[in-house]
């Protein structure tokens, strides 16, 4: 997905989250708890921010397999229909055994060369590869890609990212409401409840803080890719992993849902590189000693 589309989707998602949080806060009277004295009860606000911040993150994690299957139209390999599917299924399960994790669901989806892993725990994951990847890579390279995804599962990357996202969500909700309260009370001199200025300020602050916080999340995401590459090299071979990365680098960037740990192509640099979930292919190859 183009970076511009990702940012637009991110902003729209935050606006919807803000609307939902605001409605729930009003319905159950939460805002009355953290503004009961006319000022802000920071402890109460932090508690409620944490509840909503982590709830959203873990609900997304629990639904990740469901969302990924439908978003990518994944065909689960229950009974292999041909030798290729049989090999992919057996190779994935063999790599899972090597890594000490439960056998994941295995699937195939249409598209440019890519693969992803998702799921809420190490023993209930989904690993899927694209038809483009199967067609353009040799067996050693495909196996290295499968090993990369199994490494994500073994490292618990999805759960760790959910925890980090929960912390980030808490920070964004908490800080945005502090900014909104300051604007409403200090700048606009509104002494009765929270007016329009508060909600507008919260929306703007959530967008700004959300983008800044995403830089931290994406930085960690890039680190996990290096670790998964190294794990794949151990499960297969360094040469196979480097070969897979080089083959992937010749493909165009695929469109992947945000809920998955994708093998990933991110070639663009500059400031936008801070919002990329994957390091450049060349950097990943260098990290493997290639």
Each predicted region: which residue ranges?
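N-terminal low-structure segments adjacent to metalloprotease catalytic domains
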Residues: 1-59
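Active-site His/Glu-centered metal-binding helix of metallohydrolases
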Residues: 16, 146, 150-154, 167, ...
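Alpha-helical membrane-inserting segments
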Residues: 16, 20-32, 55-59, 63, ...
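Membrane-interfacial helix-loop-helix connectors in multipass membrane proteins
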Residues: 34-37, 178-202, 278
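Transmembrane alpha-helices and immediately adjacent membrane-cytoplasm interface residues
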Residues: 43-70, 93, 99, 205-217
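Peri-catalytic and regulatory segments of divalent metal-dependent proteins
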Residues: 60-159, 254-257
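Active-site-proximal gating segments in proteases and membrane effectors
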Residues: 98-124, 189-193, 202, 209, ...
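Catalytic Zn2+-binding segment of zinc metalloproteases
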Residues: 150-169, 241
């Amino acid at each position: 997905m183009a970076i511009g589309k990702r940012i637009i989707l991110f902003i729209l998602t935050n606006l919807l989250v803000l609307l939902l949080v605001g409605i729930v806060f009003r319905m159950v009277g939460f805002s009355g708890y953290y503004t009961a004295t006319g000022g802000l009860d920071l402890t109460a606000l932090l508690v409620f921010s944490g509840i909503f911040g982590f709830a959203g993150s873990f609900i997304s994690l629990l639904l990740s397999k469901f969302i990924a299957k439908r978003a990518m139209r994944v065909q689960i390999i229950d009974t292999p229909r041909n030798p290729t599917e049989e090999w992919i299924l057996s190779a994935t399960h063999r790599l899972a055994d090597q890594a000490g994790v439960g056998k994941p669901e295995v699937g195939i989806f249409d598209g440019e060369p890519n693969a992803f892993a998702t799921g809420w725990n190490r023993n209930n994951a989904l690993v899927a590869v694209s038809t483009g990847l199967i067609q353009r890579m040799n067996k050693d390279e495909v196996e290295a890609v499968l090993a990369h995804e199994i490494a994500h599962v073994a490292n618990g990357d999805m759960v760790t990212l959910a925890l980090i996202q929960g912390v980030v969500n808490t920070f964004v909700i908490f800080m945005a409401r502090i900014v909104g309260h300051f604007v409403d009370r200090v700048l606009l001199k509104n002494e009765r409840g929270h007016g329009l200025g508060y909600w507008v300020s919260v929306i703007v602050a959530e967008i700004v803080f959300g983008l800044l916080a995403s830089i931290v999340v994406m930085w960690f995401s890039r680190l996990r890719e290096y670790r998964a590459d190294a794990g794949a090299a151990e499960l297969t071979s360094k040469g196979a992993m480097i070969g897979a990365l080089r083959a992937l680098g010749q493909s165009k960037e695929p469109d992947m849902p945000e809920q998955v740990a994708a093998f990933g192509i991110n070639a663009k640099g500059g400031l936008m590189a801070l919002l990329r979930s994957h390091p450049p292919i060349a950097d990943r190859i260098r990290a493997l000693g290639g």
